[in-house]
Amino acid sequence: MPKSDQVLLDLNNPVFQEDLFSFGKEEAGRVFATLRELKRLSWSEVHRDKGLRWELVQSKRGPGGMRLYTIRITDKVRALVCRDDQFMRFLSLHRDHDSAYR
């Protein structure tokens, strides 16, 4: 059983999967390395990790009005995510960092 602050990943969003499968082998490998790292972290560690750059998206809301956030996945890719209790739900991946905020 995961500890109460443990990050659980939800990678089932079709848009996220489409984005992920569009990456080449090397870039996809870097994305998976970050996902493995995230799975080992607690939520408090995610918020403190300067490399991930957890940022609130002010310009839009997610499903059911949930707040949206971006995190740095690689030096070239950001993910749009929302937090749902222990789950970090991945909504999309963005090669252009600015597009994650639109």
What are these regions (language model features)?
Residues 1-77, 83-102:
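Basic, Lys/Arg-enriched alpha-helical interface segments
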